[in-house]
Structures are given as C-alpha cells and as structure tokens.
C-alpha cells in the first residue's frame, strides 16, 4: 500500500479510537476548515520592512541569526509566503505591518495611504488570503527615546496619532476589499528603563492619543481595532505605559478587541488562563501566539503544553467565533519559510487536538465530582492518534502530510533562496 493509502488506513483506525470516547472526528475536521491563522509577514525579512532606510531594528525588538535567503523585496516576500501557504492546510490570513508598504521614494509614517498597500490588496485577492494590519510604532527617529503615543512632546505625539489614523484608513480599505474585517492591532513600546517619577501622566497621554486615533468610526465589517499590552521590554524594564491593566480597561470601556501576546507576560504567567476571564468582558480577543524562552524572545511556536492549553481554552469556551488567532515570532537562525510552516502547522495541530478532546465527558465528570476520572481521561487522550487525523486532514486538502513539506522547502532553498545575498540579515 502506498503512503496515501497508509494515511487513510491509519485515519480510519484513529477515527474508531476517538469514537470510542465519544468524539466525532468528522465534525472536528469540518470545524477545522473554518479556522484561520493570521500569518505574520515579518518572519520573512527579519522585521526590516520596505521603507528603504535600512535602519536598525529598535524599541526592544531583536532578531538573531544570519540564515541566508531573507526576503529583500515585496516580490520575494510574496513568493516566500506563497510557498508557506501551500504547506499549511486551510485558508489563512496575512498580518502586515505598516512599514511593509510599496513606497516609491521617501514616505514618512504619518503620510502612508491606501495606495501604498494596493499591491498587497491585489495580491491577497489573487491568493485568496485575507489581510490584517498593524501600525508600526518602532524603528523610527520619532521613537528613538522609547516613547510614541505617550510622548511628552505634543508634536511627536501628534505624528504618531496621525500614523494611527492613516493605518485605520488603510485597514478599513483592506477589509472592504476582502469583504471581511481587517484586524488592526495597536502596540506601542512606550516605557522607561528605570523607575519613573510619574506613572500616571504617560498613561493619560496614551489614552488621549488612542481616543484621538479612534475618533472616526469605521464599520465593523471593514476593520476592528485591537490593543496589545506588554509587561516589559528591552529598554522598558521598569515601566510600560500600555500594561495589561491599562489595555484591559481601555478595551472594556471603548469596546475594542484585546490582544494577548503569549510572550508579553512574566515567564511563569500564561495567557491560556486569561482567555475565559477576559472573554467575559471584551467583545473579541486577538491572540499573538508566540514562544518566549526566559523572556519575550519570539521563538518559533512549538507544540508545547502552553500552545495546547491556549487552543483548549479557545475551543472549550466555544470562542472560535470571537477569537482571532495570529502568530508573532521571528527567527533568522533557520530557514524562514520553514519557520512559518512549523509554527503555523503547530498552531493548527493544537486547534485540532482541542477539537478532538472529549470535552463534554470531561465536564460531566468534573460536575459530578469525579476528579479521578477527569484526570485519567485527560491523560489517556494525550496519546490518542492525533497524528493520523492530522495527516488525513493535510492530505484531504492537498497539503504535504507529516514532514513531507520539508522537501518542498529544501528545493525552494536550493533554487531560489540560495540566490539571494544579504549580509545585513545578522541583527
């Protein structure tokens, strides 16, 4: 029997095992087809963008490694993304930052317009990919001292307010073009390296700046505003203006989407435990699935306990319709297309695993006080044949099963990536 036949045979056996514990595999696979992951563009070029100034990455962001093949142009980045999407089962999104526009000449960030992203809109339509967006509040002279929307200088603050206003207009145009809301996520690096004398004033300025940016209302069918918190960053170890409490309150009071990044909290703190709590009070949630190693290092997402817990909480709470799943990692030490494939496939595997969990049976045991049975079933289901179901899912949508996708990447690396030369990939 050939490999395809073996995959189907293994799937039939796996389906029987899951049925034995009350799990409808076919229903889970049907739900999987509606799951969209927002794949981040910045993994492909080490967060450099296309503004043309080749400025250093700043404001607490760092990319390490010098693996050859970094995308240097929009065409190269789009080519890399097309390969990555072909290796990932399902229809997914692209998350763009504002510094990735098609700029002909110097265009400052408060001057960007829809026309600078029309090429991306056209490409996304052709690729059947939906777009999400982000203002870029970093790696710019007006962010050199670590402050943007909370800056004490009203002129600098207004520059960044205008950038946010421009980005919302672009996001709305993207959403209108794709007939689906473009999630527009706001993260700013503002904070102090050492203990501040005034924690209140910067937060008041940030709230006022955000209110100014959001003053114009756009239809929810076009764009949704998200706000993202962080505990600390390089250069803002002692104080971050946009803390979790700040943005939680802001999202609740202004009816905005809250963004939780898996790497933006203390290393012993997990966002999986926060999901059911915040979903009681905010309309929708944006997840930045990442992997921090001792700090917000943005390692490639692996199939970790926390990744599984995040997706379990999303599925158990029946939040798939209100939670937007995005990725946020950047690693220049390995093949960048492979990084996309590994991280996105792992995120999807975790969603599938959560959909294959005997959740109702576990809840029944818990309500009846059968905590022994709950633990036993939770542990037993960990070794059920998820891989067989995953391989079937990949094969059913003409995507390489198992590690077969790696050969596609190797070939692309040999034929395409190896022809690129860029010594600046080491940051």
UniProtKB/Swiss-Prot annotation:
Coiled coil: none annotated. InterPro entries: L-rhamnose_isomerase (IPR050337), Rhamnose_isomerase (IPR009308), Xyl_isomerase-like_sf (IPR036237). It comes from the Bacteria. The keyword DNA repair does not apply. It is found in: Cytoplasm. GO terms for molecular function: L-rhamnose isomerase activity; manganese ion binding. This is L-rhamnose isomerase. It comes from Rhodopirellula baltica (strain DSM 10527 / NCIMB 13988 / SH1).
């Amino acid at each position: 029997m050939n490999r395809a036949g073996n995959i189907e045979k293994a799937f039939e056996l796996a389906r029987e095992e899951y049925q034995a514990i009350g799990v409808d595999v076919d229903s889970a696979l049907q739900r999987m087809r509606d799951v969209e992951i927002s794949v981040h563009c910045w993994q492909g070029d080490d967060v450099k963008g296309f503004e043309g100034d080749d400025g250093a990455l700043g404001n607490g962001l760092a990319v390490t490694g010098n693996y050859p093949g970094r995308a240097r142009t929009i065409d190269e980045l789009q080519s890399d993304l097309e390969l990555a999407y072909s290796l990932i089962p399902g229809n997914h999104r692209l998350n763009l930052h504002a510094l990735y526009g098609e700029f002909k000449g110097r265009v400052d960030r408060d001057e960007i317009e829809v026309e600078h992203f029309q090429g991306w809109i056209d490409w996304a339509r052709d690729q059947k990919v939906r777009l999400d967006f982000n203002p870029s509040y970093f790696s710019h002279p007006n962010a050199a001292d670590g402050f943007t929307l909370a800056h004490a200088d009203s002129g600098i603050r207004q520059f960044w307010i205008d950038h946010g206003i421009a980005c919302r207009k672009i996001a709305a145009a993207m959403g209108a073009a794709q007939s689906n809301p473009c999630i527009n996520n706001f993260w700013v690096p503002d904070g102090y390296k050492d203990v501040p004398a005034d924690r209140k004033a910067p937060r008041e300025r940030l709230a006022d700046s955000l209110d100014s940016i959001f003053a114009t209302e756009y239809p929810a069918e076009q764009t949704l505003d998200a706000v993202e918190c962080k505990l600390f960053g390089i250069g803002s170890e002692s104080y971050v203006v946009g803390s979790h409490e700040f943005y939680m309150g802001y999202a609740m009071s202004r009816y905005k989407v809250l963004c939780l990044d898996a790497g933006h909290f203390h290393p012993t703190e997990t966002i999986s435990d926060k999901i059911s709590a915040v979903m009681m009070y905010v309309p929708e949630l944006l997840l930045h699935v990442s992997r921090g190693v001792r700090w917000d290092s943005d390692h490639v997402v692996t199939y970790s306990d926390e990744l599984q817990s995040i997706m379990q909480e999303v599925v158990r709470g029946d939040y798939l319709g209100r939670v937007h799943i995005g990725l946020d990692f950047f690693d220049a030490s390995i093949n960048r297309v492979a990084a996309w494939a590994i991280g996105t496939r792992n995120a999807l595997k975790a969603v599938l695993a959560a959909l294959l969990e005997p959740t109702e049976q576990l809840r029944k045991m818990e309500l009846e006080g059968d905590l022994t049975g709950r633990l036993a079933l939770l542990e037993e289901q960990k070794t059920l044949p998820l891989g067989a179901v995953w391989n079937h899912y990949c094969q059913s949508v003409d995507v390489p099963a198992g590690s077969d996708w790696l050969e596609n990447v190797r070939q692309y690396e040999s034929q395409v990536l190896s022809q690129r030369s860029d010594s600046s990939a080491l940051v």
